[in-house]
Amino acid sequence: MIKGILFDLDDTLYNSSEFVEIARREAVKSMIDAGLNIDFEEAMNILNKIIKDKGSNYGKHFDDLVKAVLGKYDPKIITTGIITYHNVKVALLRPYPHTIKTLMELKAMGLKLGVITDGLTIKQWEKLIRLGIHPFFDDVITSEEFGLGKPHLEFFKYGLKRMGLKAEETVYVGDRVDKDIKPAKELGMITVRILKGKYKDMEDDEYSDYTINSLQELVDIVKNLKKD
């Protein structure tokens, strides 16, 4: 009997890949306008290397970009980039079209709903609140809280424990095979892969019990599972 669902957040409940890329590009443009003396594409290459080396949750991407270009710290240019990034993020941050309706229907079935996500706790909560979907979830589990992230099995076990669920009575929904679907499947959860975001073309031969193009498809899957 299915008792709960764990969701990934980024590119599962909203389009993370698109808004982040647009926000970063607009931030760099604003920094150049504020005095960062560099070609736009060259600046983006440097920024993307910083993000790759330091990780997406590193808090000083723009600081490092300015230091790499100017050889010094410039608070005006850095702050310009930060403000532009956040303004664009707020303007673009929207749930996928069927996210809210799907969460409402699942909640009406009496299921426990949780989010398990890599990232800084405050950042991930900010996204959930801005998306307007935080009231649907019984718990939100972040890698920052636990100290390890995906694909570590212990992180997923911790999430199940926090939710008071067993793996075999839990559906897991995510977009990435390597970080979401594979570890969830290895623990015995029923896995649903949503084909969204930059990893939608990632090969998956054995780990997804179901694949969906829209969250709306999840409702019928769960209804059928609850019959078993």
Swiss-Prot record:
One of its GO terms (biological process) is small molecule biosynthetic process. Pfam families: HAD_2. Keywords: Hydrolase, Magnesium, Metal-binding. The keyword Magnesium applies. Belongs to the HAD-like hydrolase superfamily. Catalyzes the dephosphorylation of D,L-glyceraldehyde 3-phosphate in vitro. This is Glyceraldehyde 3-phosphate phosphatase. It comes from Methanocaldococcus jannaschii (strain ATCC 43067 / DSM 2661 / JAL-1 / JCM 10045 / NBRC 100440) (Methanococcus jannaschii).
